[in-house]
Amino acid sequence: MAKPASIKIRLNSTADTGFFYVTKKNARTKTEKMVLKKYDPVIRKHVEFKEGKIK
């Protein structure tokens, strides 16, 4: 069987609140680490979320 194109990743908050999102990305076309600006409900602000591994 072929390896799937999309993998699950964890987006960790840069505000160090411990909050994270889980999403998918295409590992073949998006080789760099994903950085998105999303809402962190712990501090109730939009902050950057950086890609990390799912443990």
Swiss-Prot record:
GO terms for molecular function: structural constituent of ribosome. The keyword Ribosomal protein applies. The keyword rRNA processing does not apply. Pfam families: Ribosomal_L33. InterPro entries: Ribosomal_bL33, Ribosomal_bL33_CS, Ribosomal_bL33_sf, Ribosomal_zn-bd. Keywords: Ribonucleoprotein, Ribosomal protein. One of its GO terms (cellular component) is cytosolic large ribosomal subunit. One of its GO terms (biological process) is translation. Gene3D superfamilies: Ribosomal protein L33. Disulfide bonds: none annotated. Belongs to the bacterial ribosomal protein bL33 family. This is Large ribosomal subunit protein bL33.
